[in-house]
Amino acid sequence: MNKQKLVRFINKYYLNGVVNSVILNSKSDLQELSARFISGDKTLLGDLTMDKWDFENSDIGIYNTEQLLKLLDVMDEDVKVSLSKSGDKSIAIKVSDTYSSVNYMLSDTSIINEPPQMKAIPDFELSINITPQFISKFIAGKNALVETDNFTVITDGDNTKLVIGYASINTNRVTIPVTTSKVSNIENVSFNANMFKEVLIANKECESATLKISSEGLSKITFKVDNFTSTYWLVAVSEVD
């Protein structure tokens, strides 16, 4: 197995520490590894699927993703992955390469928060085209404004822009004009810029995606690249002054 493929999967839900605990669902008949996840403050919800995954059926409880990534970092690129079990329950993952092996203790899946199912999904009035140039600009802009937590989507029904650090008063800010495939004149809506930056970093190899915005305070973005499909929902933050 290629270690980097597994690490890429993990980083798409881990988001540099936004989500640390998750249940991985391995399905041998579909050759698929998937996960549904939620941030600690419940403002980010996501689901992730990787195909061409040749592994046994199992529910794998990962309580401390940071520790798992550190252990995987010890390994060479070509690895063998196996599960240690007690009855039907998976209790550890063993990863080995030509020279060494690591053992990661799994968590009981019952102590990991189960993300809620999305029920009443609002209409998305705005669809923003996400390009590699936008991804690099947003990441650079957020890195320049380290202490700024939010970005705001502003549109007049014709022109749309994302502003990191927006406020009604004069502030340090980064403004990124964007193109849209669907647009309406909605009120300004703001989201967590730190989380969105990590989503973009984890999926920066994607050539195109669409960020959908609802005036009811929800955004959705889906990335499809290589063997990965990832969807993230962000809940709007309190109105920016």
Where on the chain are the PLM-derived regions?
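Long, charge-dense
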Residues: T109-I128
